[in-house]
Amino acid sequence: MATTIQNNFRIRRNFGKINKIAEIPNLIAIQKFSYDKFLQADVPPEKRDDTGLQGVFKSVFPIKDFNETSSLEFVSYHLEKPKYDVDECHQRGMTYSAPIKVVVRLVVWDKDEETGAQSIRDVKEQEVYFGEIPLMTENGTFIINGTERVVVSQLHRSPGAFFDHDKGKSHSSGKLLYNARIIPYRGSWIDFEFDHKDILYVRIDRRRKLPATVLLRALGATPDTAKKDPVEFHGSAEEILKYYYDTETIRVEGKGKFEKDLVPDLLKGQRATRDIRDPKSSEVIVKKNRKYTESAIKKLVAAKMKSLPVEPEEVYTKISAEDVVDETTGEVLLEVNEEVTEAKVEELRKRNINEFKVLFIDNLNILPALRDTLMQDKISTPEEAIMEIYRRLRPGDPPTPETATNLFVNLFFNAERYDLSKVGRLKLNYKFGIEEPLENTVLTKRDILEVVRFLIDLKNGKPNKDVDDIDHLGNRRVRAVGELLENQYRIGLVRMERAIKERMSLQEIETLMPHDLINAKPVTAVIKEFFGSSQLSQFMDQTNPLSEVTHKRRLSALGPGGLTRERAGFEVRDVHSTHYGRICPIETPEGPNIGLIASLSTYARVNEYGFVETPYRKVEKGRVTDEVTFYSALEEEKHIIAQANAPVDKKGNFTEAKVWCRKEGEYIYVRPDEVDLMDVSPNQLVSVAASLVPFLENDDANRALMGSNMQRQAVPLLRTQAPLVGTGIEAIVARDSGVTTVAKRDGVVQSVDASRIVVKADVPTSATDVANEVDIYNLIKYQRSNQNTCINQKPIVKPGERVRKGDVIADGPATEMGELALGQNVVVAFMPWQGYNFEDSILLSERLIKEDVFTSVHIEEFECVARDTKLGKEEITRDIPNVGEEALKDLDESGIIRIGAEVKPGDILVGKITPKGETQLSPEEKLLRAIFGEKAGDVRDSSLRVPPGVSGTVINAKVFSRKGVEKDERAKAIEEMEEAKLLKDQNDEIRIIQDSAFQKIRRLLLGKEVTARLVDDKGEQLLKKGDVLDDALLDTVPQRYWGEIAVAGDVQDLARKIIDNFEEQKELVKLLFGEKIGRLKKGDELPPGVIKMVKVYVAIKRKLAVGDKMAGRHGNKGVVSRVLPEEDLPYLEDGTPVDIVLNPLGVPSRMNVGQILETHLGWAARNVGLRLQEMIEKEYGPEQLRKKLRAAFAGTEGGPASDRLAALIDDVPEKELPKLAQKLRRGMHVATPVFDGAREDEMKALMEEGSATLQSILFDGRTGEPFDQDVTVGVMYMLKLHHLVDEKIHARSIGPYSLVTQQPLGGKAQFGGQRLGEMEVWAMEAYGAAYSLQEFLTVKSDDVVGRTRMYEAIVKGENTLESGLPESFNVLIKELQSLALDVELLETPEAQAAREAAERDLGGGPLGAPRGAVASGEKSSA
């Protein structure tokens, strides 16, 4: 079994006990899936769903003109092929995008004046270019202007209805005031709120509030726009009250005698106002002033009582539920919502009306809030209500009934203006238990009525009604790339729609074609702006593969339509119980964004509505099945969920009598038969970065957060090493990140070199088919990443090896053997050493630097642009004025540095000269110019030089020239090289297809008898009739004649068919490569005014140095404080010096014990490797090796992973065993999954296998004496982080100054100075260093006059220093004067004279800025 010692596959001993049920979904699927759904590029136009781009077009089109005599309709769209591929876009600084073409139809109508009927006069259909749309690369990124960017998914509040209260903060009484808000996806918000008097108000779009009943009445006046509306509602007071209150019928039995119908539901909780007796037995069922209990109500029903007596005082406070009208006169005796009084009842009795309906309001469970609101409301008809709403929304506009109704209908019932989205509709249906179709995304009357009902129920304290938790993941949803872009596209199309409407009405529509109407500029501008400057379109973090993956899986609550850092409180940032398995509780930034930026958990995915789902295993009758289903936070609510590590036997039954479970965010202890679901895996709780931390369960959460964040900052090293102690997820991250090369099809490796791999794929084909069975993988060599780290791929397969689809065949940056490798395994000791590891400092061995263990390569890109200026063209050349030959030694004749040159700060990379402005010449100069020609004087050197702090090797140069500009020698050379590379690929591809085709013909011909003589072009015989073909004979015939060999049967026809197929494939390949070469040869698209652009790439080797930041995976970070020679470091008994000495005090208070466990397990794993190495050296037999390997890899306990490994080792052939053991010489790799890791007894067993100890005796390297106590020594995986001292060190001599204050700029990028702040001034004062202080505050900062004097003094050799006035003092005076305070500076005559003299020398006024000053805020190159 060859797989064990293949180079692209590593076996790890896995300590996990839990069998893997579900595979981790592709880590960047969220990006790809969302964008594919948006574009629907591979779906035929007629089959596309109305989502994404198709949905936007469908919602904005048709566009009609103002008179509705013509309309522009959308038919379909399609994407064309992108102009450049991904690599070309990278190199040329282009955007990777595809042109989009839209088919539109312009329909012109004729309108019949009398009947108003419309008939079609004219239809024109046309395909219109609609701008470009960026495409996503297969790694889930976008290339915008040559840089890779990621669009981060946004976590925002889901549309729907939300209920809340003010927590008693609004009113002094501390009363809870409830409110409700209907949030659409786009459109106006509706807010309902109670005030402290229990009156219900409504606000539309946060305007002034109205009584809520105004809105309810207005619903009655909406014309039948919502025909589908399920509720008949006309907005009368009676309807409103009956919708929200139950009614009781009161009958008048005589003066002061009343009774009411017995309604069991309304009696519960009421008090009896007198003894209630059974009519037959006269037994008292409910005593006076006692509550009606459930049993009492049952007795009343059993006694068949139809009505109950009512006391008069109870009746006299009731509220009438409807108008009571005298039918004879038509007079209203008792109005709806009027209080029933004794006088009113008497009036009714007189008129013989003995029955009326009242509202059931008991002031306990049912409060009169809505009735009180109606009383407050002065409006009586729906029409008035609509006018009132219009006045609120458009103050100062005189309303007419028509405009008012239009406005109201457009606000909530018009799909163009209001959109709940499917999600909003889903949420409303779920909340109120209604079954409105999801396609109806506008509000209905019922929605608004139900929101008010729910709010009133909340106020009344009805059971099972509760306020919403807005941090619940059922109320927050994810907007991924596709949806964000869809919204942008809609904005662009709406802008375009206005322009189209205007054009349709302005011009003669009959003569126009669709393309005359459409200008796609607004759409492309919006898209460009979104990708270029939106808060959610971010520069990809490309430090290492993990940072790429994490960036694509990030969820941000910030951005347009989201929160802002300042407004976000603690609740939003906090971990919520619904985050379990959906959002990682650990990985989030420290600082102001904590909790607002999160990461998706490992197994999480986003469903079609944008809610985050996590997988669970079904549990049936206490038995766990292997059926896996995804649940969103809302769907999971009612389930009881067991943990992934709950003990289960082989058949899936829980082994314990009770199981710890989660339900609705609480932790409960239940019987196995009550459990519904079970977690899929222990690491489904955390994100990718957190699940790469071994022994995460033993680390404090704060440190785990730092650990997972710092792994993203690890720099890819020159020599990669996968961790000895991993978690088993490393290979998945490396595969999904896209930095490795993955085989596309099964096949056999044909050839391998450093820059490409050729694989002959297994293509099942028919006898005559010649399919393209070649996969050529061109590897990325020394490319610069966004963070200036180096992207380089190296093959890990050999020719002749079989590869499977999905296998890693080439390692990328920070990967080794297809596994993520962010750092190095080093031997660490926990002990203090001479104070050099005080406060988290790190002491290093010189070996790490000598052997380049932590060396990384960084690539800087420098760009030089030759422009066409007003004074003439700039030129890139070797001929530079006033520069010695020494400085030009590495430039070629085109003025560009040669590849391989070593450069240091100040060296010329690209020679460039710029024309100078003409100056007034003296007569002598004119004469000299006339005699010697005038070349040298009129140009200045503006070459690109290496900036300070950069020294390295030039690894690449690229030249881009404008179309029509003659290419220089260097550009031609680069072009030829690229062309040769492409031709090589083409020829290889053709060669492999040819071999395969003639192999097929050979198989057909072998053993056949020739039926006719075969001659070549010259008439010489190649085969004679009757020859029997074998390999040797066939090889004598040139391949081009094989199709002409005559044999019996249809073999010759088949052979000819194969040759024809081969020729066809060959032409296809040539065409493909021809296109690429054509693109290479044509000129480049450069920005306006640019003639030529040169990019030079310099590779810098950064060794580990004092001041570099290093970290482990457990949040244990530190700075290198000293590099010690190997001989001075503490060493072990066998003489091995340790590599790193860490401070033991970094562990207890930080509570990240995981690092100690990792150290022990790493030590055990390393020692197992050493023991195997000894066994090979002592030539042990294969069976002993096998036994040792089995013990190390499979352990004694077994488990699904160990059993597989044991079987694997048993299958290894004897002669390959030493080879396998040899691969483990640096240590055996183990995996300890998060929350399911190695136990203490397993670690001890492995220690014994490698005869390692938990603590070792260490000897002092300087004296040879053993240290007093045993020391914890082991192997830890250490990372070098991106905070490198070489990139931070900076010094300034003379540089740019700020324009106003004349003080030096700040920061390395501006070549700025060091700030001397208030406290530093105090320190200097405390020392009494007056002259130094004066110098700091004047000439070294902003004393313009003093700076000049200082220069003069130095030139003249004088040692006196006279400081003048700091410029910022003048600024202060001017600012005071601007406040109308007349501040004047009084000068002594000497000072005045000195100042004037200096100003004369400077040639400026008091604010005359010297050369080199720049406006602050502008970046200036030093």
Swiss-Prot record:
Catalytic activity line of the entry: RNA(n) + a ribonucleoside 5'-triphosphate = RNA(n+1) + diphosphate
Keyword vocabulary terms for this entry: DNA-directed RNA polymerase, Nucleotidyltransferase, Transcription, Transferase
UniProt-listed PROSITE patterns: RNA_POL_BETA
Signal peptide coordinates: none
Keyword Nucleotidyltransferase attributed: yes
InterPro entries for the chain: DNA-dir_RNA_pol_bsu_ext_1_sf, DNA-dir_RNA_pol_bsu_external_1, DNA-dir_RNA_pol_su2, DNA-dir_RNAP_su2_dom, DNA-dir_RNAP_su2_hyb_sf, RNA_pol_bsu_bac, RNA_pol_bsu_CS, RNA_pol_bsu_protrusion
PANTHER family: DNA-DIRECTED RNA POLYMERASE I SUBUNIT 2
Protein name: DNA-directed RNA polymerase subunit beta
Organism: Anaeromyxobacter dehalogenans (strain 2CP-C)
